[in-house]
């Protein structure tokens, strides 16, 4: 279950589409109400559609609310602004997993050097290890294409990790074997994937048939309360309703939601955005 507590991010990654929605952050009161409702649907939240939770100075209060409702949390962040003030917050009991989008550095024009970016992240990981963290830490390298720039960047990342964590990761072996993940230390992994194109109504139709995990394994709630069928509908092109005016159970019982779900079960894509989504082809 993806809940976007803010759509604010302090980077403009080339792999993210332009944000069309106004800047917004979900209020703590509304977030509390959504967590209360979501207990009937999930045990786990991902604080992400777009936006970076670490930009919020009161992130701990959101985590407190999820913990109160016995919900575990996945955090995805570029960690561009991570510093020691985040260390204790990111040891919160609600957290199940932290994903660091490491290849975000290579997808931006930075004033920071690579070491200025990566060193504070490594500092946090070592702090978490000293605290015997029980959650998973993933370094996402989602750029395993064949471009030289990405491969050279990845080589630099691996060399840094090899030195800091006594590993022996070879960039050529990674590109040759294409592993899904590599263990760095206890509950600390590299996670690999390739770039993908975000779905857009401006795209060409990919297919009118197929299936998806949207509205099955997950759905999304944007920071303004709009409910969407999946974690890639950042602009609510498929606006299923709004949690500011409707209960989640009523939104999920709507005719439109049922039509989408039944379509996926019968290999039919009813929504235009789904027909224009390349990522969905992974599930065919």
Describe the residue ranges of each PLM region:
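Short, acidic, Ser/Thr-enriched surface-loop or helix-capping motifs
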Residues: 221-222
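Structural recognition of alpha->loop->beta junctions
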Residues: 35-39, 86-107, 155-184
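C-terminal accessory region of radical SAM enzymes
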Residues: 124, 128-136, 166-207, 232-282
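Conserved alpha-helical substructure of the radical SAM core
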Residues: 1-98, 109-119
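Short loop/turn microsegments at loop-to-beta-strand junctions
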Residues: 215-217
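Short cysteine clusters
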Residues: 9, 13-16, 212, 230-231, ...
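Conserved strand-turn element in the central/C-terminal portion of the radical SAM core barrel
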Residues: 107, 126-157
């Amino acid at each position: 279950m993806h809940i976007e507590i803010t759509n604010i991010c302090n980077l403009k990654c080339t792999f993210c589409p332009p944000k069309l929605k106004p800047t917004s952050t979900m209020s703590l009161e509304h977030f509390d109400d959504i967590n209360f409702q979501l207990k009937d649907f999930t045990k786990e939240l991902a604080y992400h559609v777009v936006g970076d939770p670490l930009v919020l100075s009161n992130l701990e209060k959101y985590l407190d609310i999820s913990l109160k409702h016995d919900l575990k949390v996945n955090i995805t962040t570029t960690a561009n602004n991570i510093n020691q003030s985040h260390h204790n917050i990111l040891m919160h009991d609600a957290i199940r997993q932290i994903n660091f989008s490491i290849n975000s550095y290579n997808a931006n024009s930075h004033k920071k050097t690579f070491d200025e970016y990566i060193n504070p992240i490594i500092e946090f990981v070592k702090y978490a290890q000293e605290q015997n963290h029980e959650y998973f830490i993933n370094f996402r390298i989602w750029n395993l294409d064949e471009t030289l720039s990405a491969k050279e960047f990845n080589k630099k990342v691996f060399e840094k990790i090899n030195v800091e964590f006594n590993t022996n990761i070879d960039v050529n072996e990674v590109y040759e074997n294409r592993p899904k993940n590599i263990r760095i230390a206890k509950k600390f992994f590299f996670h690999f994937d390739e770039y993908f194109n975000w779905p857009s109504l401006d795209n060409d139709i990919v297919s009118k048939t197929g299936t998806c995990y949207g509205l099955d394994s997950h759905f999304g709630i944007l920071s303004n309360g709009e409910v969407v069928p999946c974690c890639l509908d950042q602009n609510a092109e498929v606006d299923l309703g709004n949690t500011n005016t409707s209960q989640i159970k009523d939104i999920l019982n709507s005719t439109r939601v049922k039509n989408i779900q039944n379509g996926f079960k019968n290999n039919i894509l009813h929504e235009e955005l789904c027909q224009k989504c390349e990522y969905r082809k992974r599930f065919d």
